[in-house]
Amino acid sequence: MRLVLFAVSSPYAAEAVETAARLGWEIAACVRNVDGPPIPPEVADVVEADELDAKLLAIPFTVPLTTPGHRYAATADAQSRGFTRPAVLVDPTAVVAASATLGEGAYVNARAIVGAGVRAGLSCSANRGASIGHHTMLGDYVSVGPGAVTGGSCRIGTGAFLGVGAVLAPEVAVGANAVVGAGAVVVEDVPDGAVVVGNPARTLRQGRGHGGVGVPAVR
């Protein structure tokens, strides 16, 4: 299996490289679509986005970015340039229930757990050691940070971001483009665009998504 890394401007690209290595996949190229040094530059040839050829465009690709809005924009950029095969990248140390469904472009990092009946939309990301409870529904481009835990039957909206070690009580809903801060404990529903922190989580402010960049409701 060969894989293209598209948008290699984030250190998180190194995580995708490690997962690919554990799977025995070859990194065919690292595509740089914005100015700046590619990270990591030593893994494969660095190709500028304006210099892609048909052979590369035929290879499955992944977008190794943690911010949902940036991942959405880079995925749209990749597809506009002719990539058509978003890879589902699952680390061999992760556990994904047979009854779970992962959308195109998903990345499940090392030792993450995706529970029974989970439904994840397009290009969702479960970072190291995250645990997504049974029958949880994730909208498109959701990011679940390292060590974050959701109880069963949670609903997480498009573009939402759960920070490192965040905890969601069972059946909690997190709105689209909301941000749950690192270590927050969420026991009540979180509105769209809200930034919540603390234990119990409280609204700090209204925002437009992690990093100030949201994901539109595309479907």
Which residue ranges define each predicted feature?
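Terminal amphipathic alpha-helical/low-complexity segments used for targeting or macromolecular assembly
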Residues: 1-92, 201, 209-219
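Structural signal for interior beta-strand "rungs" in well-ordered beta-sheet cores
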Residues: 88-197, 201-204
